[in-house]
């Protein structure tokens, strides 16, 4: 039996972005493309098929100069007036309280924005500036996906600040934070460490206090940028003290294509509501799902005894309780965001790395990320928190591994645990993996939830 229950202490080694903007020069040719040829056909087909089901954003690049990736965080600090030194953070947040008077009383008082008003391009010059590769390089000589999650989170916030920018305000009174990662679908398996990367994105839907942001990542090869992933984030605007919702500028379409994108954003909102309403934490499983759970139960009964308690693991299977990894993080000031709480991108990176390790241990081979979906930021993580992470394989099918990572903060004084995030990752392995088998009712609900997420992802790719 493969036992994966391991508790580990993982340290923080995240570098703060220094905000220096080296000159952008043409990219060097991409090297080492032989990796893709070694893939089994099922992996190659799955991870190069592209994403579907979402409208293609119109070209908005004309007249926009790209931003160096190292300048994104520094721009955010300038927009909100954040301190670069931890010892000054209390004073900086006190100064933001005075910005309350700049908040709009009604959304109708704010000027409408177009999609192209928030459009941004960010360059990650891994090919043309080799000195920045070290931060992004993994042991397999490809780009660390966790670092990409950090960059996407920062870019999404900057796009929203661009959408809500008021010309007469030197500092924004809004506190814009990530509320949800709706989905990230990858159409390439390998992100090469020696080819330039370009991120693009803009606001694609607006509520009264929330904004949906669509972002795309492309990588340069043979003189052309080819798609790597599409991402949809949902951001919320709060007051300067991050206590109450704040109104944001409405979004107006200029073309029929943009009208469809806004309609899709509204549909995405309704889908999220429906998915939440049907959650297994609120509603009983469907009749079909109950039959699935009962079949699993019957298949694990020991036929040599007439007992409901005697269970036997089927061939080529792993008990769910033996398919998990755990980790602990001490949240240092180095990992804070512009509002002096722990950076959401950092949380996503750590959760992904634990999820990847869980899938790697389970499948006994290198897994590749296929999709990220439904990451809900339920509460902020304060600096100094003890962050507990638990990665669980909750569903498998052929080469696919569905991993759920649960994140919670632990208060050592009160000994209370509070959930902060739940992450869902879909991986694909080079080989077919054993079937994960739930034993308890709670594990069966995790199994069904993982099955639901996996089915939703398979419709997208």
Positions of predicted regions on the chain:
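A cross-kingdom feature marking solvent-exposed beta-strand/loop segments within repeated
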Residues: 169-198, 364-388
């Amino acid at each position: 039996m493969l036992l994966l229950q391991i508790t580990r202490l993982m340290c923080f080694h995240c570098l703060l972005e220094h905000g220096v903007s080296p000159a952008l020069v043409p990219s060097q040719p991409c090297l080492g493309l032989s990796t893709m040829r070694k893939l089994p056909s099922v992996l190659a087909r799955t991870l190069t098929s592209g994403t579907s089901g979402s409208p293609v954003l119109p070209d908005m690049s004309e007249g926009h100069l790209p931003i160096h990736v190292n300048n994104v965080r520094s721009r955010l600090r300038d927009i909100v007036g954040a301190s670069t030194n931890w010892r000054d953070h209390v004073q900086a947040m006190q100064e933001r309280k005075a910005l309350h008077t700049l908040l709009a009383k009604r959304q109708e008082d704010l000027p409408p924005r177009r999609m192209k008003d928030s459009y941004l391009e960010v360059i990650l010059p891994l090919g043309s500036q080799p000195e920045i590769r070290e931060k992004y390089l993994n042991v397999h000589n490809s780009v660390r996906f966790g670092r990409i999650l950090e960059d996407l989170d920062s870019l999404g916030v900057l796009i929203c600040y661009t959408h809500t920018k008021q010309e007469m305000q030197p500092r924004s009174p809004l506190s814009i934070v990530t509320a949800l990662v709706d989905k990230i679908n990858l159409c390439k398996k390998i992100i090469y460490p020696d080819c330039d990367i370009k991120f693009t994105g803009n606001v694609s839907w607006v509520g009264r206090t929330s904004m949906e942001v669509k972002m795309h990542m492309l990588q340069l090869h043979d003189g052309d940028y080819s798609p790597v992933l599409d991402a949809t984030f949902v951001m919320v605007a709060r007051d300067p003290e991050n206590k109450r919702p704040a109104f944001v500028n409405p979004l107006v379409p200029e073309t029929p294509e943009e009208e469809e994108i806004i309609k899709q954003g509204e549909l995405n909102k309704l889908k999220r509501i429906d998915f939440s309403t049907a959650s297994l934490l609120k509603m009983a499983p469907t009749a079909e799902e109950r039959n699935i759970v009962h079949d699993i139960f019957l298949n694990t009964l020991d036929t040599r005894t007439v007992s409901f308690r005697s269970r036997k693991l089927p061939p080529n299977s792993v008990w769910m309780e033996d398919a998990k990894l755990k980790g602990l993080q001490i949240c240092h000031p180095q990992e804070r965001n512009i509002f002096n709480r722990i950076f959401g991108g950092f949380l996503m990176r750590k959760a992904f790395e634990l999820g990847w390790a869980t899938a790697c241990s389970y499948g006994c081979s290198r897994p590749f990320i296929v999709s990220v979906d439904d990451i809900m930021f339920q509460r902020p993580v304060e600096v100094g928190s003890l962050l507990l992470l638990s990665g669980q394989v909750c569903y498998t099918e052929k080469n696919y591994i569905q991993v759920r990572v649960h994140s919670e903060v632990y208060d050592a004084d009160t000994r209370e645990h509070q959930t902060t995030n739940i992450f869902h990752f879909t991986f694909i392995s080079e080989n077919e993996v054993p079937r994960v088998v739930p034993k308890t009712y709670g594990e069966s609900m995790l199994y069904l939830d993982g099955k639901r997420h996996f089915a939703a992802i398979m419709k997208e790719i």
